[in-house]
Amino acid sequence: MIKEELNLWAEGVEFRHLDAYYNFILSVLNFLCIKEYELSVILCNNEYIQKLNGEFRQKPEPTDVLSFNYFEGSEQINHKIQGDIVISLEYLEFSSLEFNVEMYEELQRNTIHGILHLIGYTHDTNDFQNETMLIIQERVLRETRRVF
């Protein structure tokens, strides 16, 4: 039986576009041919993600996105997802200014980034020209429709 379960919520932040964001995530999953998923996405503030980053990565500082993969056999690329993505909207406000992009584009980029990690992609650098995962990320961002 194929499971398709997607949950979204906001923790410590207000986000008024959950329906549009939900549809965006579904379009990314479809584009990446992910048919089986149990995925939760939490939109949060820096305090919330900093706590998780410290606890699970021993980096007590805020970050943009964290992915938690619960699927056994996650060492290789797999088109099934069982995991969580946590994204700090507060952090994205800063990074969108730094990269001179709209905040919602940065949210879409980080959502795709988290999904790619959950299906097994990794990257050693942030080189958008040479890292396979980041090249795929930008392609998915271009190809999926803008929803905000």
Curated annotation (Swiss-Prot):
The keyword Nucleus does not apply. It comes from the Bacteria. One of its GO terms (biological process) is rRNA processing. It is found in: Cytoplasm. Its cofactor is Zn(2+). Its EC number is 3.1.-.-. Signal peptide: none annotated. Pfam families: YbeY (PF02130). One of its GO terms (cellular component) is cytoplasm. Binds 1 zinc ion. One of its GO terms (molecular function) is zinc ion binding. Disulfide bonds: none annotated. InterPro entries: MetalPrtase_cat_dom_sf_prd, YbeY, YbeY_CS. Zn(2+) binds at residues 113, 117, 123. Keywords: Cytoplasm, Endonuclease, Hydrolase, Metal-binding, Nuclease, Ribosome biogenesis, rRNA processing, Zinc. Its main location: cytoplasm. NCBIfam families: rRNA maturation RNase YbeY. Single strand-specific metallo-endoribonuclease involved in late-stage 70S ribosome quality control and in maturation of the 3' terminus of the 16S rRNA. Belongs to the endoribonuclease YbeY family. This is Endoribonuclease YbeY. It comes from Borrelia recurrentis (strain A1).
